[in-house]
């Protein structure tokens, strides 16, 4: 994705109204709400690549005694906080949401790559599969390894029908601040918030 396109999309996302951020107090929140919008990039800017090469998210070695996060519950659409972002994406020609879902969980240990499948978190999301993981160490990280298959990829990507595109990335995140994960074929807007406001988050 070109710098110009990325800048325009970030402006769109960050310009959407979000609830005011809470003060980040003690870094000991145990349950987090995670909300994701996965959207298709219809513009196809970025140029042809070898789409058979699957990227791998960088990170530390697997810990000796990894802790796996616990799935708490699915969050209903009535409690979504990124609806304004979703609406703005729907009103563009180039970025169309393909899945919007949220859930609550505790964090896995840093480097464990222990997460939950899209099927568990989102149910039926045509063409979309993979895993999403939340890790806690010195900082909080949200990572994902997502596959998106479409019968009509954007022509600019020079990809055959049915090509499987892979987005694999892990990054440090801040609670209450939207994060953006991009790929020439599709992208993700993510928001992590503490489920219990009284405990804060890191």
What is the role of each PLM region?
Residues 1-9:
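Bacterial N-terminal signal peptides that target proteins for export
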Residues 17-20:
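N-terminal signal peptide c-region/cleavage motif recognized by signal peptidases
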Residues 23-173:
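Extended, low-hydrophobicity segments enriched in charged/polar residues
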Residues 166-202:
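C-terminal partner/receptor-binding element of secreted or periplasmic proteins
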